[in-house]
């Protein structure tokens, strides 16, 4: 149990070392990031999304950008720190799910480290994008599918699976495609 704590701390340190160049080097502000900041800024000024602001950002993403602008104004550092927090939650949860399913003979942090590397490769997953926020809830849905595959008769888990995919769709609309993934997983692996 003590070893698991050290592995978790080392996983967090590993991820922060991966993100340190971005946080310290002052990454340039890219057009999608600026667009998200402007959506939050306009919503903070009282404009309504889809009525006054014509953008393709999903409703919960717009709400998140509005809250960040409300508390921190147009700060790229706030967006990067929020992205790091969301990414850390994802990494730790993914590692937890993999370790509780005993995919490896011993508990280790290799799945979380690989997930951290993959998060750092893509721009959409290294900033506070709608895709990153939706991915959090898709990971929660993945955890529910794993539980459903173990305990085949639990209707509350099926509801939570759909709820998480629905919330992910409210952050990033193309995430609704994963509803098909959830249905197929339930159909093929549980016989439901």
Which residues make up each language-model segment?
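Membrane-interface transmembrane helices that cradle and orient dolichyl/undecaprenyl
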Residues: 139-157
């Amino acid at each position: 149990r003590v070893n698991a704590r050290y592995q978790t701390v080392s996983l967090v340190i590993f991820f922060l070392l991966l993100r340190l160049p971005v946080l310290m080097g002052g990454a340039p502000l890219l057009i999608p990031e600026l667009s998200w900041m402007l959506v939050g800024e306009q919503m903070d000024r009282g404009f309504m999304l889809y009525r006054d602001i014509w953008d393709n950002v999903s409703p919960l993403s717009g709400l998140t950008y509005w809250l960040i602008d409300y508390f921190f104004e147009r700060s790229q550092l706030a967006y990067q720190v929020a992205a790091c927090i969301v990414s850390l939650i994802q990494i730790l949860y993914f590692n937890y799910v993999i370790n509780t399913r005993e995919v490896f003979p011993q508990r280790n942090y290799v799945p979380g480290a690989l997930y951290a590397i993959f998060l750092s490769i893509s721009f959409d997953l290294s900033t506070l994008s709608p895709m990153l926020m939706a991915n959090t809830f898709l990971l929660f849905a993945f955890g529910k599918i794993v539980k459903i595959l173990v305990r085949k008769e639990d209707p509350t888990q099926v509801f939570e699976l759909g709820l998480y995919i629905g919330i992910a769709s409210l952050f990033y609309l193309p995430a609704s495609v994963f509803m098909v993934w959830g249905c197929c997983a339930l159909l093929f692996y549980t016989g439901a």
